[in-house]
C-alpha cells in the first residue's frame, strides 16, 4: 500500500497540497510546451535510464502498477479497427515514477483534437473487449475545452492513491479531447453493481469538487447505441 503521507486526499484542497508537496516540478505548468502539438513525449524523455536518475533512493510503492496509453489522432484515420491505434506509453509502480512520467507528457490542454490519453491498471487494456472491462461501464465528467488539466490530475491522484472505497472496481480513466469540450471518464468492472458504481461516482465528484449531475453508461449499451446510449445511473 502506498505510504499514507505520499498520496492521501479526501478533498480538492488535500489534493492540491499533495501536488505541491510531491510534484518535483510543481504543478507542471508550461514546461511541456516544447513538445509538438499532439505529441505525448519525446523518444528520449521516457528512456528508462533517464527515469531511473529522477527516482529517489527510497521510492514510495503504489498498491497497483498503472500504465499510460495514448491514442494518437493522426493515426486513427489509418486504422480500420477501433482501438488499433492505442499504444502503451509507460508503466509505473511508485509515486516517483508517476511524477517522472506525468511531467514529461502533454496535459490535456496541450493535446491535439481527437487525442485520447488513458491511465489503466497494469495488464488491463483500455478497450471494451478486455475481459476485465467487458461487463463494465463508465462515469463521465465534461469540461470546457482546455479546462480539464486539474480534473485529470485529481482523478489520477485519487485512483493511484487508492482514495475510492470501491477502488477494486476501477479499471482506469481516460481523457478525451474533442472540439468544444474535454471528457474525463472512469471505467469500472461490474456495471450491474449499482451500489459500487454509485459510491465511485459520488466520491469522484467530491474529489473534483464537481457539483453537476454525472451519468454512468454500460459499455454494452455504448457498443449497441454509440452516442445514443442512455445513462443507467446518475449522481
Swiss-Prot record:
One of the protein's GO biological processes: regulation of translation
Compositionally biased tracts (Polar residues): 8-24
Gene Ontology molecular function terms on file: RNA 7-methylguanosine cap binding; RNA binding; translation initiation factor activity
Major localisation: nucleus
PTM (free text): According to the redox status, the Cys-133-Cys-171 disulfide bridge may have a role in regulating protein function by affecting its ability to bind capped mRNA.
Cysteine-cysteine disulfides: 133-171
UniProt-annotated location(s): Nucleus; Cytoplasm
InterPro entries: TIF_eIF4e-like (IPR023398), TIF_eIF_4E (IPR001040), TIF_eIF_4E_CS (IPR019770)
EIF4G-binding as annotated region, ranges: 60-63, 70-106, 154-163
One Gene Ontology cellular component annotation held by this UniProt entry: cytoplasm
Region (Disordered): 1-36
Keyword annotations: Cytoplasm, Disulfide bond, Host-virus interaction, Initiation factor, Nucleus, Plant defense, Protein biosynthesis, RNA-binding, Translation regulation
Superkingdom of this protein's organism: Eukaryota
Binding sites annotated in the UniProt record for mRNA: 78-83, 110, 128-129, 178-183, 223-227
PANTHER family: EUKARYOTIC TRANSLATION INITIATION FACTOR 4E RELATED, EUKARYOTIC TRANSLATION INITIATION FACTOR 4E1-RELATED
Family membership noted in the UniProt record: Belongs to the eukaryotic initiation factor 4E family.
Note: Displayed sequence is cv. New Hampshire Midget and confers susceptibility to zucchini yellow mosaic virus (ZYMV).
Known function: Component of the protein complex eIF4F, which is involved in the recognition of the mRNA cap, ATP-dependent unwinding of 5'-terminal secondary structure and recruitment of mRNA to the ribosome. Recognizes and binds the 7-methylguanosine-containing mRNA cap during an early step in the initiation of protein synthesis and facilitates ribosome binding by inducing the unwinding of the mRNAs secondary structures. Key component of recessive resistance to potyviruses. (Microbial infection) Susceptibility host factor required for viral infection by recruiting viral RNAs to the host ribosomal complex via an interaction with viral genome-linked protein (VPg).
Quaternary context: EIF4F is a multi-subunit complex, the composition of which varies with external and internal environmental conditions. It is composed of at least EIF4A, EIF4E and EIF4G. EIF4E is also known to interact with other partners. In higher plants two isoforms of EIF4F have been identified, named isoform EIF4F and isoform EIF(iso)4F. Isoform EIF4F has subunits p220 and p26, whereas isoform EIF(iso)4F has subunits p82 and p28. (Microbial infection) Interacts with potyvirus viral genome-linked protein (VPg); this interaction is possible in susceptible hosts but impaired in resistant plants.
Protein name: Eukaryotic translation initiation factor 4E-1
Amino acid at each position: 500500500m502506498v505510504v499514507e503521507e505520499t498520496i492521501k486526499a479526501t478533498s480538492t484542497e488535500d489534493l492540491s497540497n499533495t501536488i505541491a508537496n510531491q510534484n518535483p516540478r510543481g504543478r507542471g505548468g508550461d514546461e511541456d510546451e516544447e513538445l509538438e502539438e499532439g505529441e505525448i513525449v519525446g523518444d528520449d524523455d521516457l528512456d528508462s535510464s533517464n527515469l531511473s536518475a529522477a527516482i529517489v533512493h527510497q521510492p514510495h510503492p503504489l498498491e497497483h502498477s498503472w500504465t499510460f496509453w495514448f491514442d494518437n489522432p493522426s493515426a486513427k484515420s489509418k486504422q480500420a479497427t477501433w482501438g488499433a491505434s492505442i499504444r502503451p506509453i509507460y508503466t509505473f509502480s511508485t509515486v516517483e515514477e508517476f511524477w517522472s512520467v506525468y511531467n514529461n507528457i502533454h496535459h490535456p490542454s496541450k493535446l491535439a483534437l481527437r487525442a485520447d490519453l488513458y491511465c489503466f491498471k497494469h495488464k488491463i487494456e483500455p478497450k471494451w473487449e478486455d475481459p476485465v472491462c467487458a461487463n463494465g461501464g463508465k462515469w463521465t465528467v465534461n469540461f470546457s475545452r482546455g479546462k480539464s488539466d486539474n480534473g485529470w490530475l485529481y482523478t489520477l491522484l485519487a485512483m493511484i492513491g487508492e482514495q475510492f472505497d470501491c477502488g477494486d472496481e476501477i479499471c482506469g480513466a481516460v481523457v478525451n479531447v474533442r472540439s468544444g469540450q474535454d471528457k474525463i471518464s472512469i471505467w469500472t468492472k461490474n456495471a450491474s453493481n449499482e451500489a459500487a458504481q454509485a459510491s465511485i461516482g459520488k466520491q469522484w465528484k467530491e474529489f473534483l469538487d464537481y457539483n453537476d449531475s454525472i451519468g454512468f453508461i454500460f459499455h454494452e449499451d455504448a457498443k449497441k447505441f454509440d452516442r445514443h446510449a442512455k445513462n443507467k445511473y446518475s449522481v
